[in-house]
């Protein structure tokens, strides 16, 4: 008889049977079917299509989420500032990607971006706050 192995979804925290969980890459860990469909698959698709991703920080009214930016090369400085709600700071991930965040996010006490913090490439010294844009270096003007 097989032992019942219960784990928690790495994205929403829901308890799931490990045998029915999904590989959540590019996020860390295993996820439930709902998060696989709503977050993991769209993220993989966007990264494979060279789209940029906007990881939205949680607010009073939402838990945060992920939006796809289909033509990141068309984004102006003003567009980037609008998406992160302030002045931008660029973080080089030392691979093909950069992050764009609100430079003053900590000063304004923006919430920790829990969705971004679950990405495999999120191993930075400090957790990021506010909205986070992940895009390829070549797409940045």
Map each language-model feature to its residues.
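Surface loops and adjacent helix of pleckstrin homology
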Residues: 21, 44-45, 93
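Detector for the mature cores of small, proteolytically processed
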Residues: 49-141
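Short linker/helix segments within small regulatory modules
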Residues: 19-29
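Short, cysteine/histidine-rich loop/knuckle motifs that typically chelate Zn2+
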Residues: 10-13, 34
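Cys/His-enriched microdomains
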Residues: 7-8, 29-30
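Short metal-binding segments enriched for Cys and/or His
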Residues: 36-48
């Amino acid at each position: 008889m097989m032992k019942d192995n219960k784990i928690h979804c790495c994205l929403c925290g829901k308890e799931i049977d490990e045998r029915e969980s999904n590989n959540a890459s590019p996020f860390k860990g295993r996820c439930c079917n709902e998060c696989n469909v709503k977050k993991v698959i769209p993220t993989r698709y966007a990264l494979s299509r060279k789209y940029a991703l906007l990881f939205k920080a949680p607010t009073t009214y939402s838990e945060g989420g992920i939006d796809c930016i289909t033509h990141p090369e068309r984004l102006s400085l003003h567009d980037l500032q609008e998406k992160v709600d302030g002045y931008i700071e660029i973080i080089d991930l030392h691979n093909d990607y950069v992050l764009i965040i609100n430079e003053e996010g900590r000063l304004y006490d923006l919430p920790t971006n829990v969705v971004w913090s679950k990405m495999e490439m999120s191993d930075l010294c400090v957790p990021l706050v506010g909205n986070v844009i992940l895009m390829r270096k070549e797409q940045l003007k």
